[in-house]
């Protein structure tokens, strides 16, 4: 599973694959940074150590997955298909808000059947970098957002460490430190850290390997 911090629907079925997860997104002037851990589990077993939970919805719009791996990826695939058609009809890239609304509508429509939470972030010409939460059918724009089972361990840290007006590199460091802290505390989060930086210039992908993760006092 990508086990969400606040799952929806029924309890996980035995053997269901989940991403017991830590996901995060941060706005900066001119773009966004998204990050996630990479551990996927089925029950007590880790079935994938390097799963990329940052899924593209469009050229400069991504979502971060948590909850049931199958459910979350299905929502992302449906949203990406609708946004592709939307872009063709408009003859221009879709807005990040439109993408977040598509994800929100799918999640709410199938809320009784799905165990998934997707965080949407990206860049468009109208609003620049944006981060949206879609949990439970709500749609909220935030300067930064965290989610997944690991997020419960880092609320205090992110509230204290976040500063408005951070540079892209500061946002990447903030995201890396927060996810690494969650991975050190949450048994369902682990592996490597995937980072995506989205700006008008394009998308920059980075991977922070296990031996490159920040070290903390308790380690």
Curated annotation (Swiss-Prot):
Class of enzymatic activity (EC top level): hydrolase
Residue stretch(es) of the prosequence: 1-20
Active site: residue positions: 21
Effect on the protein of changing residue 165 to D: In PRAAS3; digenic inheritance; patient also carries a mutation in PSMB4; patients' cells show reduction of proteasome content and cysteine-type endopeptidase activity of the proteasome
SUPFAM superfamilies referenced in this protein's UniProt entry, alphabetically: N-terminal nucleophile aminohydrolases (Ntn hydrolases) (SSF56235)
Enzyme Commission (EC) number: 3.4.25.1
A Pfam family the protein falls into: Proteasome
Note: Encoded in the MHC class II region. A model for self-activation in which residue Thr-21 serves as nucleophile and Lys-53 as proton donor/acceptor has been proposed. Subunit processing of mammalian beta-subunits proceeds via a novel ordered two-step mechanism involving autocatalysis.
Similarity comment text for this entry: Belongs to the peptidase T1B family.
Name by which UniProt lists this protein: Proteasome subunit beta type-9
